[in-house]
């Protein structure tokens, strides 16, 4: 019984230690297909390598939050960092600007990364 208690305490201590580690997310904004004006496409925001898991991600059109956005389930890598994919349908043109805004404990303020149609 004592051995079980010791093992349980070690597991709890190791898990609580993971919460102390913080890694800033890497943010990548890209379209599923090469951008063509007037042709429907998908805008993707891939956020990876972050810890802890609490994160807020918004896709933006001309600085305003896009409401109809879907996302993958929160997943983790071998190093226990997390990753997510947020995406929405959009139709590129020359007048609209698209971006991904991410809020995470490792950022002093939300970070916004613009979509570059040439990437």
Swiss-Prot record:
Q: How does it assemble?
A: Heterodimer of an alpha chain and a beta chain. Beta-2-microglobulin is the beta-chain of major histocompatibility complex class I molecules.
What is the name listed in the Swiss-Prot or TrEMBL entry for this protein? Answer: Beta-2-microglobulin
Cited SUPFAM superfamilies: Immunoglobulin
Listed as disulfide-bonded, the cysteine pairs are 45-100
Signal peptide: which range, if any? 1-20
So what does this one do? Component of the class I major histocompatibility complex (MHC). Involved in the presentation of peptide antigens to the immune system.
Q: Where in the cell is it found?
A: Secreted
- Superkingdom of origin organism: Eukaryota
- Cellular component annotations (GO), alphabetically ordered: extracellular region; MHC class I protein complex
Family statement drawn from the similarity comment of this UniProt entry: Belongs to the beta-2-microglobulin family.
Give the InterPro entries listed for this entry: B2Microglobulin, Ig-like_dom, Ig-like_dom_sf, Ig-like_fold, Ig/MHC_CS, Ig_C1-set, MHC/Immunoglobulin
One of this protein's Pfam families, by short name? C1-set
Name the keywords, alphabetized: Disulfide bond, Immunity, Immunoglobulin domain, MHC I, Secreted, Signal
| Ranges that cross the membrane | none
What is the scientific name of the source organism?
Cacajao melanocephalus
């Amino acid at each position: 019984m004592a051995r079980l208690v010791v093992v349980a305490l070690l597991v709890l201590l190791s898990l609580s230690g993971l919460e102390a580690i913080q890694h800033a997310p890497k943010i990548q904004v890209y379209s599923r297909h090469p951008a063509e004006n007037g042709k429907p496409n998908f805008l993707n925001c891939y956020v990876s390598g972050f810890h802890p898991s609490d994160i807020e991600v918004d896709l933006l059109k001309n600085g305003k939050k896009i409401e109809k956005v879907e996302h993958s389930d929160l997943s983790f890598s071998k190093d226990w960092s997390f990753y997510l994919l947020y995406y929405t349908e959009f139709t590129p043109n020359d007048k609209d600007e698209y971006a991904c805004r991410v809020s995470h404990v490792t950022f002093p303020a939300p970070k916004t990364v613009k979509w570059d149609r040439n990437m």
